Amino acid sequence: MELEPIADKLQSAGLGVKAKSIFIHAMPVECKKGILLRSPLQGTQIDHELPGYYKAQFSVICRSHNHAEAVQLANDATAALKGYNTTVGAMDVRHLLPNHLPVVFPVSEGNFIEALVKFDICFSM
């Protein structure tokens, strides 16, 4: 699935700037506070029962030096993205929903905290 419209939505919500604090597929180590969007390797499922509909998952990973700030950024991203029957870029989204609350990972080598939320999306184009 194309993650660029998701990045645009996060930028429109005031959660960062693409290529400076919102990234797709890889976040540079120099970024001290930011959001990374990643899609799984299996790609986007085609719904053969409903032609033109697709199902996918993607991850939102929020980084900060501060635990509470990383979790808050993940919660803010969740609030900006989740919903039903909306348009995101060229996608007519039936649902875009988080699977869980933020999962916080241990401090990384760069001394960062990262909080992960996985999302399900069902859409047509």
Predicted features by range, described:
Residues 1-50, 72, 79, 84-91:
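Small/polar-rich, solvent-exposed N-terminal microdomains that initiate assembly or binding
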Residues 34-36, 58, 96, 117:
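A broad, low-specificity signal marking well-ordered, structured residues that form hydrophobic/aromatic
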Residues 68-69, 75-80, 100:
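Surface-exposed, low-hydrophobicity beta-strand/loop segments enriched in small/polar/acidic residues
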Residues 81-125:
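Acidic-leaning, charged glycine-interspersed low-complexity segments
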Residues 52-68, 112-123:
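Oligomerization/assembly interface segments of phage tail-like spikes and tubes
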Residues 45, 68-70, 125:
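Residue-level signal for secondary-structure boundary sites
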